[in-house]
Curated annotation (Swiss-Prot):
Protein name, entry field: Polyphosphate kinase
Enzyme class: transferase
Gene3D superfamilies in alphabetical order: Endonuclease Chain A, Polyphosphate kinase middle domain, Polyphosphate kinase N-terminal domain
Organism: Neisseria meningitidis serogroup C (strain 053442)
Pfam families the UniProt entry points to: PP_kinase (PF02503), PP_kinase_C (PF13090), PP_kinase_C_1 (PF17941), PP_kinase_N (PF13089)
Function: Catalyzes the reversible transfer of the terminal phosphate of ATP to form a long-chain polyphosphate (polyP).
Catalytic activity entry: [phosphate](n) + ATP = [phosphate](n+1) + ADP
Keywords for this protein: ATP-binding, Kinase, Magnesium, Metal-binding, Nucleotide-binding, Phosphoprotein, Transferase
Name of the coding gene: ppk
Length: 685
């Protein structure tokens, strides 16, 4: 196969992932309000796609227009391909919302009322709502030499209003801009009695269209057109110019709201001259204009399920499994000393990790606590426990990653609070994101210091621990806990990388470990020994790993990869990758665990890791991979993380050589296997 065709386009692969998510919104087996949620997830993902990936392609095209990307194409060619795919996906989204979901919701008594269908009583209520809730806070900006075109915030809802007449100062007016503050709901619920006892909603844009004239008394409104600008949201900090990273991040967060435009969304009813006017204001081309059949922001529909009390239209609740040995008065440290603990979230509760930190904060025998924070949410019992530990006089060290994309402001806030509580807060290593998920507790026992560590594949975030699938290992293994301590010393101090006993770390040893393990399986296959690689991750795009997998496949290694999102490897190509199979599982839970298993002549070397197989994870982040050696725990990781995923025939998508996906289905006479439901049955409470 030609060199340029061996690697697929990562952006197209990411859009293909979102197409699989959108299939959940189409699936009649998914509860109706959950289908609406999946539609919103796709919109949110697309926002980030334009803010990050499309913005990167635009920058690359400007700086290196002739440089070929990993997929063998130049940036301009890739932009054209990606734009076409994005348009197709967005059209599909709106068709689904307008022609499928809205009618199905209406049959369930959940209505989105268009202006032309408002009853007189609804019109009266909506006008009162506008007068009471919107009119006092909206600020129209007329465009003239003293009122230049305003700079809209990233992804904010705005309206271009065409006017006729003269204002109070005798000025002729042609156009004004009205910005809708983010604090306003984009979907407004109507009183039940106005909806025949059901649930009714109107879009904020519809309310503004109907009553925008009240913002311009005495003027004639000729037209009102919603628009939304997506901006480049890359956050860059120059290492040489920064004295205080936290302060620099805070400054950059403000500037990010006003990055270069990458996408302009308007309703399909917007006239051509308004579209052209807006494109000129934002220095965008027609290729960057997206006309949609409906509201320009479907993300905000995610408020609807919480406003509708219809359990029959939502997923049934699950009960998480709990660590039975952790009784009311039991010590988690005593449990860990007996044997390492493996947790599989969300099927098993995240509470033992929280309990470990709570107990550490209150236990007089605990001398020090260390933890990394990448994403932790706006409310965190873990961070509260760290603050309590610091206030109790313990040595608390927290590595807060301030560059966690779109969580920067939240992490800055936690960093301030932790410092005020007396914790030592470190902002990682400049130029390398600290993505490793690790915690360490140091306790005095019988006159000797004993370490306890937690290593995970997911964030210390209690909210996402109920949604994302992840593994966590809690252990008192002396070599692993010593390694975790060494990693914290590397991050917080200065010096050369320490020698690790069992863990592998990026950016130093993890990539080499993966390449070496693949090479070993390749040699085993060449020698006629059984050879197999099974791995699960979020993304696989690193070219040297892909080429190593191709070599392994050519040698006869059987390779099964479970990759939820981006995968730029081509599976199933004769002579290149015929022994590689790739599947993606999309379901109620977000598959997030990273698990690698190398057969190694029957030893089944198994790791859980914070790292995907991407260049950034191997070379530009601090990551960990921990071996799972306890026989029972290894069996669990292989079965729950890999084998059951490979058996799924209800939510699995099978990747094709061209980068497309086909949904798996049970063969004739085969029973259904549903990874996530089966794990709830196996591990749930």
């Amino acid at each position: 196969m030609p060199e340029q065709n061996r690697i697929l386009c990562r952006e197209l692969s990411l859009l293909a992932f979102n197409r699989r998510v959108l299939a959940q919104a189409e699936d009649q087996n998914v509860p109706l309000l959950e289908r609406l949620c999946f539609l919103c997830i796709v919109s949110s993902n697309l926002d980030e796609f334009f803010e990050v990936r499309m913005a990167w392609l635009k920058r690359e095209n400007k700086l290196h227009p002739r440089r070929r990307l990993d997929n063998g194409k130049m940036p301009s060619e890739t932009i054209a391909d990606v734009t076409e795919a994005a348009r197709s996906l967005i059209r599909h989204q709106y068709d689904l919302f307008n022609n499928v979901l809205q009618p199905e919701l209406a049959r369930e008594g959940i209505h989105f009322y268009r202006r032309r269908n408002w009853t007189d009583t609804q019109k009266k209520w909506i006008e009162d709502y506008f007068d009471r809730e919107l009119l006092p806070i909206l600020t129209p900006i007329g465009l003239d030499p003293s009122h230049p075109f305003p700079r809209p915030l990233n992804k904010s809802l705005n309206f271009a209003v065409e006017l006729d007449g003269t204002d109070a100062f005798g000025r002729p007016s042609g156009m004004a801009i009205v910005q809708a503050p983010r604090i306003l709901p984009r979907v407004v619920p109507l009183p039940s009695e106005l909806c025949g006892g059901g649930h009714g909603f109107v879009f904020l844009s519809s309310i503004l269209h109907a009553h925008v004239g009240k913002l311009f008394p005495g003027m004639n409104v000729k037209g009102c057109h919603q628009f939304r600008l997506t901006r480049d949201s890359d956050l860059t900090v120059d290492e040489e110019d920064v004295q205080n990273l936290r302060a620099a991040i805070q400054n950059e967060l403000h500037d990010r709201e006003y990055g270069d435009g990458v996408r302009l969304e308007v309703a399909d009813t917007c006239p051509a001259y308004i579209r052209d006017f807006l494109l000129a204001q934002f220095k965008l081309t027609a290729a960057e204009l997206y006309q949609v059949k409906g509201p320009v922001n479907l993300v905000r529909l995610n408020a609807v399920p919480d406003l509708v009390d219809r359990p029959d239209l939502k997923f049934p609740p699950h009960t998480q499994g709990r660590l039975k040995a952790l009784g009311k008065n039991g010590s988690i440290f005593k449990l860990i000393r007996r044997a390492p603990i493996l947790l599989h979230h969300p099927y098993q509760s995240f509470n033992p990790v929280v309990e470990m930190m709570r107990e550490a904060a209150a236990d007089p025998a605990v001398l020090a606590v260390k933890m990394t924070i990448y994403r932790t949410g706006t409310r965190s019992e873990l961070v509260r426990a760290l603050m309590k530990a610091a206030l109790a006089g313990k040595q608390v060290t927290v590595v807060v990653e301030l560059m966690a994309r779109f969580d920067e402001a939240n992490n800055v806030n936690w960093a301030k609070q932790l410092e005020e509580a007396g914790a030592h807060v470190v902002y990682g290593v400049f130029g390398y994101k600290v993505h490793a998920k690790m915690a360490l507790v140091i306790r005095r026992e019988d006159g000797v210091l004993k370490r306890y560590a937690h290593l995970g594949t997911g964030n210390y975030h209690q909210g996402t621990s109920r949604i994302y699938t992840d593994f966590g290992l809690i252990t008192a293994d002396e070599q692993i806990t010593a390694d975790v301590n060494t990693l914290f010393m590397e991050i917080t101090g200065l010096g050369k990388p320490g020698r690790l006993n069992k863990l592998y770390q990026s950016p130093f040893t993890l990539h080499k470990m993966v390449i070496d393990r693949i090479a070993r399986e390749t040699e085993h296959a060449k020698a006629g020994k059984p050879a197999r690689i099974t791995a699960k991750m979020n993304s696989l795009i690193e070219p040297t790993v892909i080429e190593a997998l191709y070599r392994a496949s050519a040698a006869g290694v059987q390779i099964d990869l479970i990759v939820r999102g981006m995968c730029t490897l081509r599976p199933g190509v004769k002579g290149l990758s015929e022994n590689i199979r790739v599947r993606s599982i999309i379901g109620r839970q977000l598959e997030h665990a990273r698990v690698y298993c190398f057969h190694n002549n029957g030893a089944d070397d198994t790791f859980i890791s914070s790292a995907d197989w991407m260049g950034r994870n191997f070379f530009r982040r601090i990551e960990t991979a921990a071996p799972i050696t306890a026989p029972e725990l290894k069996k669990r990781v292989i079965r729950e993380g890999l084998e059951m995923a490979l058996a799924d025939n209800t939510h699995a998508w099978l990747m094709q050589p061209d980068g497309g996906y086909i949904r798996a289905a049970p063969a004739e006479g085969e029973s259904e296997a549903d990874l996530q439901n089966d794990l709830w049955t196996l591990l749930g409470g």
